[in-house]
């Protein structure tokens, strides 16, 4: 099955059996913070903003805050900054039986630690996007449950959201991007 084949790409020895070099496929992993609050998305934003601000001011990290299109916000940390903050060199793990599992756990633990440094409790948040095969929606894609756009925030959008007291998911979307998309067929 495709699932079985995919699993073979996760393990260096299985890649080797297929004539592939594991380190050519897996080039890095980034830190990702996932903040959700279905009833109050601005609470999720405030926590994401606090973590991104902390990482930028304390570590000089390049961070991107993204509206998830649903319940909250993601903070993406750039690849080089993620490597530096986690302190893992992928080459040190390529001979491990399941390096992506070990590396993913290190990333998941680091988001809890860094959020705590920023004064944000992350112990109940979803850390799965940092695990071995963690995924998040791609910016500018459409969230299938809400129909909202997964939207990266620029400073103008961040400032607008900082000035709000309470918004629904739709209210967040209206605040950060236009709804009347030109040339869209009806």
Task: Report each predicted region and the residues it spans.
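SsDNA-processing nucleotidyl-transfer enzymes
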Residues: 1-41, 120-126, 186
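Helical (often loop-to-helix) elements that flank the catalytic cores of nucleotide-handling enzymes
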Residues: 8, 14, 40-58, 77-123, ...
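Short beta-strand
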Residues: 22-23, 63-69, 126-130
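Histidine-centered divalent-metal-coordination microenvironment in nucleic-acid enzymes
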Residues: 30-33, 62-92, 135-141
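Accessory, usually C-terminal, subdomains that scaffold auxiliary metal cofactors
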Residues: 117, 127-150
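C-terminal accessory extensions appended to soluble enzyme cores
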Residues: 157-186
């Amino acid at each position: 099955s495709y699932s079985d084949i995919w699993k073979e790409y996760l393990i260096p020895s299985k890649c080797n059996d297929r004539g592939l070099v594991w380190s050519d496929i897996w080039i890095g992993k980034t830190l990702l913070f996932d903040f959700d609050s279905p009833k109050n998305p601005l609470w999720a934003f405030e926590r994401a903003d606090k973590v991104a601000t902390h990482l930028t001011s304390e570590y000089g990290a390049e961070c991107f805050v993204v509206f998830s299109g649903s319940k909250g916000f993601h903070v993406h940390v750039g690849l080089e900054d993620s490597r530096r903050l986690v302190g893992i060199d992928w080459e040190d793990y390529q001979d491990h039986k399941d390096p992506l599992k070990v590396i993913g756990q290190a990333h998941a633990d680091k988001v809890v630690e860094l959020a705590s440094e920023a004064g944000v409790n992350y112990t109940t948040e979803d850390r799965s996007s940092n695990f071995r095969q963690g995924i998040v929606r791609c910016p500018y894609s459409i969230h299938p449950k809400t129909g909202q756009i997964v939207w990266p925030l620029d400073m103008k959008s961040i400032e607008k959201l900082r000035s709000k007291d309470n918004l629904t998911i739709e209210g967040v979307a209206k605040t950060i991007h236009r709804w009347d998309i030109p040339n869209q067929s009806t």
